[in-house]
């Protein structure tokens, strides 16, 4: 299982140094881009993707929490994103089908409050799934769902051993072993890596 470091929780005034200082704790970088509409917060700029691509050698996992996704997927891919996740709550199935036709490595995310059954229709077009386990937009929040219960719900809907499963939100050091045992491929950590 890989660890993806959520840079939203890092020191924004000295980001590259904070990444370097904690480099032994993660495998890739997770970049949350929010718009103040899908979430109650405005997050990182799209430019951070190109800056991190130029200044680090990490795989960049970009998590878009936006009302409008298509033009921003195109931009973050141009800027160097290796994987992009959009949300089923703001991306209908036709838009998502077009995204996966035009771009590689586009995944689908789901909020902790949404019915997991929604993912069935998206599974035809992607094998990358992100289970958000906190309410979106802010770092260092408590979990909104039980991680293992949510994973089991996911497995009951998407039965694909080739899937890449990402769990994002409130993941502690103690959660890592159970997540790996339950088939999670990528665990996103913010506060657990960079501190609170």
Task: List where the protein language model places each region.
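Conserved N-terminal beta1-alpha1 strand-loop-helix module at the mouth
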Residues: 1-85, 91-94, 98, 106, ...
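Glycine-rich phosphate-binding active-site loops on the catalytic face of alpha/beta enzymes
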Residues: 84-92, 130-140, 182-196
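Short, aromatic/basic amphipathic alpha-helical patches
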Residues: 98-100, 181
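Internal catalytic-core helix/loop-beta-alpha segment
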Residues: 105-113, 130
């Amino acid at each position: 299982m890989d660890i993806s470091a959520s840079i939203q929780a890092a020191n924004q005034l000295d980001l590259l140094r904070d990444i370097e200082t904690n480099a032994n704790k993660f495998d890739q970088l997770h970049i949350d881009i929010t718009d103040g509409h899908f979430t109650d917060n405005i997050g990182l700029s799209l430019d951070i993707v190109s800056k991190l691509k130029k200044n680090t050698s990490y795989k960049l996992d970009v998590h878009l929490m936006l009302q409008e996704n298509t033009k921003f997927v195109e931009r973050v891919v141009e800027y160097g994103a290796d994987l992009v996740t959009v949300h089923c709550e703001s991306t209908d199935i036709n838009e998502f089908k077009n995204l996966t036709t035009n771009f590689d490595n586009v995944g689908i995310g789901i909020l902790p409050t949404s019915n997991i059954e929604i993912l069935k229709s998206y599974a035809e077009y992607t094998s990358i799934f992100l289970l958000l386990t906190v309410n979106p937009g802010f770092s260092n929040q408590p979990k909104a769902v039980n991680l293992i219960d949510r994973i089991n719900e996911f497995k009951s809907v998407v039965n694909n051993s080739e899937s890449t499963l990402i769990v994002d939100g409130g993941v502690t050091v103690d959660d890592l072993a159970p997540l790996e045992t339950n088939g999670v491929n990528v665990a996103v950590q913010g506060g657990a890596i960079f501190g609170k």
